[in-house]
């Protein structure tokens, strides 16, 4: 992130605000580092709301992906040869040797390790399809009973679509409610800054939804405020806005 964003975050925390990272990424690698720097004593939302972790204590109020649903996904992945990643709060696994799987590990900031996706020893909270951009529609059209799909792209891998799979009903919006309750706040006192389709559920439950200048149309439509592009320090602008709103 840009230096002015970190400076604005420090001012916000010093003013008594709770800052919460809300991301599709897991609570390890680069995303964990961002959360720890953003608000080192706070609760943060990872994995599209499936993983809610206090980065100071390691406590978790996460949502499990039921085993029977996981087994269905694994069977489909092995049958089609499609990249599937499986996540707990603190680690992940993939059986794929495809270059997208390798590149994604680097983007997450963790070593690439090929391993049995059913070998994880703690509670699974999410799976993720990793597909070419032109493969998104087919995956989204497939039946996923009992599950919610959360598609998102990344400028770090512009030719790839990441489709998170959680238990049905899990969303960033639900996670925002749970984090707000941890702080004794109502969601109408909260701000959500978003730019993607997977941010919309959270933007709809807060009192101050903000769209980045690079936001997708769905995020813009869900917003009350707009700030600059992420590459131009728009997040710092949003944090400054938060400090002057009633």
Named regions from a protein language model:
Residues 49, 133-134, 153, 213-217:
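Short, polar loop motifs at secondary-structure junctions
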Residues 10-14, 78, 143, 204, ...:
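Anion (oxyanion) recognition and catalysis
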Residues 38-40, 48, 56, 143-146, ...:
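Short, structured coil segments at secondary-structure junctions
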Residues 3-104:
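Active-site phosphate-binding/coordination module
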Residues 30-32, 55-56, 96, 139, ...:
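Short glycine-/acidic-enriched loop or helix-start segments at secondary-structure transitions
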Residues 2, 165-246:
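Mg2+-dependent phosphoryl-transfer enzymes with acidic/Ser/Thr/Gly-rich catalytic loops
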Residues 80-83, 87-193, 197-205:
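Conserved acidic, metal-coordinating active-site core of Asp-based
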């Amino acid at each position: 992130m840009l230096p002015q964003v970190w400076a604005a975050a420090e001012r916000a925390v010093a003013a008594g605000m709770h800052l919460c990272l809300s991301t599709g990424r897991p609570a390890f690698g680069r995303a964990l580092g961002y959360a720890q720097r953003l608000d080192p004593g706070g609760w943060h939302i990872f994995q599209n709301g499936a993983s809610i972790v206090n980065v100071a204590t390691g406590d978790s109020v996460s949502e499990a992906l039921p085993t029977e649903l996981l087994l269905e996904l694994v069977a489909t992945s092995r049958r089609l040869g499609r990249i599937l990643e499986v996540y707990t709060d603190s680690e992940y696994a993939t059986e794929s040797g495809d270059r997208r799987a390798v590149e994604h590990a680097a983007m997450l900031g963790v070593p690439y390790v090929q391993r049995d996706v059913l070998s994880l020893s703690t509670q699974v909270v999410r799976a993720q399809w990793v597909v070419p951009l032109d493969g998104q529609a087919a995956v989204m059209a497939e039946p996923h009973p009992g599950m919610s799909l959360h598609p998102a792209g990344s400028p770090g891998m512009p030719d790839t679509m990441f489709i998170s799979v959680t238990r049905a009903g899990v969303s960033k919006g639900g996670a925002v409610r749970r984090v707000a309750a941890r702080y004794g706040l109502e969601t109408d006192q909260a701000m959500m800054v978003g730019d993607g389709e997977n941010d919309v559920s959270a933007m709809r439950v807060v009192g101050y939804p903000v769209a980045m200048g690079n936001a997708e149309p769905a995020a813009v439509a869900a917003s009350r405020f707009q700030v600059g592009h992420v590459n131009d320090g728009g997040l710092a602008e949003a944090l400054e806005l938060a400090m002057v709103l009633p």
